[in-house]
């Protein structure tokens, strides 16, 4: 199947795309492309790297125009010398093959979950934003990455496992204090498209592996994501949303209290999604009261954190005699809830 972004280019642009891809794969020092607006060539170069995350070593280029020529010459700027690139290509291929082999016989949904959890449990967000963290060698080679490198790693693993996957990009929004563009994935499971943002879940996975952004619809993802600036497909179905699949998505307050009591008894964390209408402060207050009552019945104190935009609550329980300042703080107080930031890497 032709690469996604390649399919959405005009014929003349596909010729440029092919020349760029061929030149980069061959590690050419320079190569020709048909003349076009430099800004458009830059965008096509960018799209090649979204379609082909295995091209991790070429991040920018210079253009040269020769008099009386119908072509432009591209001079790629490589992150490493060619010997190092070839060594890293072998290492990345072996790494991807090994990771993919572990779930090669699983279902598409199981493979997707494996990739997501691998990212959340093994990769650290690189707040220094080193150049290689934007490429697959960051997460897969060094265990660190930013959203672009993480989304590319998800795609290269999906490609290896036969899962349809693209990388999508949203613009920055300084008015909302969003300093950087953001990258995540759209995957196709069965015949349905879903948003998958492993970076946001990684940011939330401090004590538990989170799945707040696993298989979201457009309606859900754009509660806290900016509009996509690249070509993409609509995601109208949220039926494989993780918490829905795991029966951890509730519409009734009594359901939440019952499950909280079970978790408190076992002294296990309780992670759930609320879909019983918009999560207002009033509804949150009622949920917190039920959780606190369930905790006290089991001799526990509840500590609650909240991803408010996605209506996901994380509840942890501790013994009453271990609770800090238990007489001074009530966990059923909305103001005592920790508000989580899933997009901390993109904020100003």
Residue ranges: model-predicted function:
Residues 182, 267, 310-314:
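Active-site lining segments that contact anionic ligands and/or coordinate catalytic metals
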